[in-house]
Amino acid sequence: MDEHPNKFYLFGGYTLWNEHAWSPSDDRVRGGKSRSLLVCSADSAVATFSGDLDITALGGAGFASQRTVDPQSWDLLVYQGLSLGVAKSDGKKYTLVLKDDTPPKRPDGREESTVSWEYDFVPGSETEVTASWADFKPTYRGKPKPDAAPLRLDHIKRISIMMRSFFGEQQGPFRLDLNYIAAIRAESMSED
């Protein structure tokens, strides 16, 4: 058997979803009112990321996200990207976020800001979204950070799914049903 399959399921697929492996990280940490949930189907085959994106409290800005709980660590060096199996989508724009470190805590208990690697996508229902590592762009507090050190693919510590306003572009209820999140090898990448 191949030590590194073409598709390595991080969540879903042969690795069932576990809602306890995820935690909310919403704009409430900055005084916002957005909320998110990640709930698994009865058979743990599908995870529903849903909530309400409220942009009124932060002047047109806002975000609602679910992130993996610490500690986690994935070595994805032999893979070329990530794939999301989408069961159902509301047609809104989502962001997949990777971190290669665990942010330290500030004295007030909140996490310090660190570089994130982000990929924006608008999924259809019953589709597969694929993103190569080059599709993930470094950001710091939501702004591009072109001088960031390269993403350490052998040291991925956190994965997040985010709904954000893109400064007033979208708001309100959202829902994305996912079959899986998987690391993929070149053989599995779809041609554009």
Locations of regions flagged by a protein language model:
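Beta-rich carbohydrate-recognition modules and glycan-binding surfaces
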Residues: 1-192
